Amino acid sequence: LVDAGVSDKKELMSNPKFAELLKGFGVEPPLKISTTTDKETFAFAKSDEGFKALLNHDNEKVQSLVAARLGTKSTLEETRTQRFIDIARRGLLPVPVRYYAAHTGRWGGDDKINLQNLPSRGPNGKKLKSSIVAPEGYSLIDCDSSQIEARVLAWLAGQDDLTNAFAKGDDVYKHMASSIYNVPSDGVSKDQRFVGKTTILGAGYGMGAPKFQAQLQTFGFDMELDEARRIIDIYRSTNGAISQLWRDANNMVQYMARGDSVQFGKDGVLQVDARKNAIMLPSGLPMFYHGLAAEKSDRGYEYTYRTRKGPNRIYGGKVVENVCQAIARCIIGHQMILLAKKYKAVLTVHDSIITCVRDEELDEAQAYMEECMSQTPDWAEGLPITCESGTGKSYGECE
């Protein structure tokens, strides 16, 4: 580390500085397409294949540098573990939650206890989750809304064949793989189904071939760019209504910026209030794009809106993603209200709700919870909702 010029851990934690350290040893930093910005960024996550490969680099100094970076990052996990230990000494685990943490209204962690991103992979995998246990005589139920964003997307776009497949309980990942590889659904291999799953869950918001290729690589699945491009083309041609929704949303951004109020989505279910720069969701929740403005660029006009972190670019696919996540959030909230008639939610993580019940009520409570989380709100008629649940004495056992 001294040879590399590392003086403190800040140089290891900073992506640009760490990239310069690698270049000092003649190593080009691995890159990926950011799923947040759609731009090229450093692939320095411990799950990134290019980064993991550096642990076996021919130069031992590069190996040491990468190991030190991973060790520094692991201190964050150590800090959270210590926080759990300190809380356990005081009694029960509080679950502080920010009610509207993201632009789409998703809940978020607070008070230095972020239960939204507990690790589930790696050497310490589920240890933190398994440390969250029910009191004596109680059990936990973890119920997850299955594929909720993909279902919302199909319903919102009026992609009726996909919506009907979800409603019938078909394996839509196999169906997608069947179209991609031109094989019968019952002949789809495990790897082919994985590609079908990644396509259904990833390509629905306008993802391009380079980003799709990069996403597969993060799972250790190598694919040529031409093949990734072929798969994206098949997804878009197979799901024409979804592709049209992106275009409609892109036009909507332009209309909103001009001050024109319009409708889009299935049967005009999304109402645009241009005076407030807001999209009114069918649940009644407004989603704002404050300070929406057009900027001239080499590619024409680009649109941005104001956030606490500065201007954020917005376009058709991103609008659709925002709307689907916000609608999914509203559905989870609706389900929590139904559940609260009999049982209290003790935690919500992404698309799942966790409750704590007496052991003698476990089967009844699990059945009631699945019933609540399979109900579609009145404002989302025709949207097929389903769920999966697990039980255990600890949060980790529920999965």
Where are these regions (language model features)?
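Helix-rich, typically C-terminal accessory recognition domains appended to large enzymatic cores
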Residues: 211-212, 332-333, 387
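Acidic, glycine-rich two-metal-ion catalytic cores of nucleic acid-processing enzymes
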Residues: 8-187, 245-352, 359-360, 366-372
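Short, positively charged loop/turn segments that connect secondary-structure elements
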Residues: 185, 221-231
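A general structural motif at alpha-helix termini
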Residues: 16, 22, 216, 232-235
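Polymerase palm active-site segment centered on the conserved acidic dipeptide of motif C
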Residues: 1-11, 227, 231-258, 360-399
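Catalytic palm subdomain of template-directed nucleic-acid polymerases
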Residues: 153, 211-223, 236, 240, ...
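Alpha-helical scaffolds flanking conserved acidic
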Residues: 189-199, 343-344
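Extended amphipathic alpha-helical segments enriched in small hydrophobics
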Residues: 199-216
